[in-house]
A protein has these predicted regions:
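Basic, helix-initiating cap at the start of DNA-binding domains
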Residues: 1-21, 25-37, 50-51
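Base-recognition residues in the alpha-helical recognition helix of bacterial helix-turn-helix
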Residues: 19, 43-47, 55, 59
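Short coil/turn segments at alpha/beta junctions that flank glycine-rich nucleotide-binding fingerprints
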Residues: 20-24, 75, 96, 139
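Key DNA-contact positions within bacterial/archaeal DNA-binding proteins
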Residues: 40
Length: 193
């Protein structure tokens, strides 16, 4: 029988707790209870809640990077890659309650750690998009533009369509979101042939 990885057990329990209760309301006691370990076990791996939260963010960010890199095919056009990455990230977001909870906590309480966590996630996405936009610009697939500005705008559009819209309307399907990305981006930055 394989040994139990207590550290991973703690991380999974903390992820679950942060996703259910948010950063502010999560306690080490809750994490210990969910992980079915003593509170002291948590402190053998993490000195405090902030360090545990940071590790979870590192894992989430790495998972998102892996998704993006897996879905980018060098032989494919920029927009084909964009839509593949978008599909996968939409599925990831749907299945990852932590990011949704952090956004809600930031909105409701303005928790600094929630803001910093979401900012880290956004920076990784922005850096990735900026690099891909630069490549697309160099290959002539998109018009001359500032990749950082376009990356920022793409992230805001993504958040608007996947989250902000849902506050007052029925959520958009993946196909609708892709359709709006096509409408707003391809007609705006795609090279006209």
């Amino acid at each position: 029988m394989a040994p139990i990885d207590r550290r991973q057990q703690v991380i999974q329990a903390a992820t679950q707790s942060f996703a259910m209760f948010g950063y502010k309301a999560t306690t080490m006691d809750q994490v210990a209870k969910i992980a079915n370990v003593g509170k002291g076990t948590i402190y053998t791996f993490f000195t405090n809640k902030e360090q545990l939260f940071d590790q979870i963010l590192v894992d989430v960010i790495q998972e998102m990077k892996n998704i993006a890199h897996r879905e980018v095919h060098q032989e494919s056009a920029f927009f084909e890659n964009l839509f593949r990455v978008l599909d996968s990230l939409l599925e990831f977001r749907r299945d990852h309650d932590l990011l949704v909870k952090l956004a809600q906590e930031l909105k409701d309480f303005g928790t600094l750690q929630a803001k910093e966590g979401l900012d880290k996630v956004e920076k990784v996405i922005s850096d990735f998009l900026t690099r891909e936009l630069e490549k697309a610009k160099e290959s002539g697939e998109i018009r001359d533009c500032d990749p950082q500005v376009v990356s920022f705008m793409m992230i805001r559009l993504y958040i608007a369509l996947t989250s902000d819209w849902n506050k007052q309307h029925e959520p958009l399907s993946k196909e609708q979101i892709k359709s709006y990305f096509r409408l707003f981006l391809m007609e705006g930055i795609a090279v006209v042939t």
